[in-house]
Every structure is written in structure tokens, then in C-alpha cells.
């Protein structure tokens, strides 16, 4: 990873010398193959990472309340109900860091991922702290991107855009299985019949294949549809939510560890207007 200009990172080592006060790392690199990138201001062939490798250009707003007990919200603190944001991070981040690290804190207590509402509710500030082998005083660098309401992204100037996805959903069960061979997840994405929002499932940075996907209520006369995904034989870490326009973000569930004491069976009926869930414990009838 490279640094911005200024005094904060000026004494950090960069190739054969110090980074200095005038060098400024680019916000993105058009070369998608990391092994083919050349280092800025130095020119040698060497992989490096920019803020745009870890953060999305556009943040996704959702007009629903997020259950923060079951899903990580990026340490965002605000009181507005019926509004949430999908994490604007990319799967590549999990090639280098675990889910627990992304949800956790730096040695100085600051969170690795932090989100704040801008003044006047004009947008969202996202800070991603990346650990480095730095100096005694600097153990991480900070990537910061501001996402503004009702505008497109301007990555050249590190200004993020904002869009809205109208959907809801659930994961059943919200449990990490001790034996992955026993794992079975039913995941639903409920949205307007005209929307084209899809879920992708990842473990670490590897995309998983779900067993099947079915759609309820595809009839255009019905307002909403439910896309149901069945994932078997593996745990997963996060869901990448994306649409046909290329906007994407990540849902990071907070899974509970499976307890081998009790067994539950669930039956879910996704109706046109209501969702009905029944369950039984063990061998109960």
C-alpha cells in the first residue's frame, strides 16, 4: 500500500528511500492485474494497492433498519431509522484480512473500519485502517473516502457517489457450523419484481457456488419477488450484493457458533404479503 502526501507518512521507507512530503499515492490504478503494476514515482514492476482496490466507488443506501446485532454496520453511529448502508468494501480486502480483523480494532483502539455521517447528513465518511510494518509511531495507514448524496463517483478526486437499493432479506440459520459438511443455509433477497439485485457468497476471498436459486412471485402483477438461495456443505463469511448497473457492497453477518446441544428445523413460507416461519426443536411434532 502507498501513502498520501504530507508530514504524517513522510519518514516511512519507500523502496530505496523515504516516502517524503511531496509524493502522493494515486487513488486508483487502471491495471487490474496487481503483478503488472509499476510503482508510482519509481517505475519498477511491483504489485501495490490503492484505496480503490479496497473501497467501492459508490456506497449503497438501503431504506430499512439494519439489525446491528446480526450484521456489522462499519461502526456507524446515527439515530435515523429506516435507513442503513451496505459496507462499501471489496472482496479483495478479505484476501489479506479476516472477518474478525475487519470488525476489530487497531492496537491503539481505533476500529479498522469506521463510518460516520457527514455534517448536514450530506453523505458518509468511510475510514479504512490498514496495518503496516511502519515505525514505532505509525503502525497503520488510513484510507479515507467521502461518499456524497445524490451524485456519481469521481474517483480521480477520491469522491465517492451514493445510490439506493430497495431490498430486504434474511439468512437462516445465522450460525457457523462446527462441521461444514452439515452446513445448510437458506438466504432470501426480497425486492421489487423490476429490480435485479443479486447475492454472491464468499468464504475468505473465494466466491462460493450455491446449490440452487429459486424465485417466488415473478408475476409482474405482484409488487415483490423473493429470490431464495440454497447453500450447502460450507460456511460462508459474507455476501456481496450487486445489481446490473455494477454497484456493489458487502453484507457482513455476525454468525453465532453452533451449539451441539439442540437441533431445530425451520419451515418458511414466503407469501405475497407476509412471511410465515415455523420451527420445531429436536423430535417435537
Model-derived segments and spans:
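Ser/Thr- (and often Asn-) enriched beta-sheet segments in non-cytosolic proteins
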Residues: 98, 114, 125-129, 140-147, ...
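Short, small-residue-biased leader/transition segments that mark boundaries at the very start
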Residues: 1-2
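Gly/Thr-rich phosphate-binding beta-strand-loop-beta motif of the actin/hexokinase/Hsp70
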Residues: 256-284
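Short glycine-rich, Thr/Ser-proximal phosphate-binding strand/loop in the N-terminal lobe
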Residues: 130-152, 283-285
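Acidic/polar, low-complexity linker and loop regions
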Residues: 77-102, 217-259
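Low-complexity, highly charged intrinsically disordered N-terminal segments
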Residues: 122, 145-232
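Non-catalytic protein-protein interaction scaffold segments in large eukaryotic complex-forming proteins
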Residues: 5-126
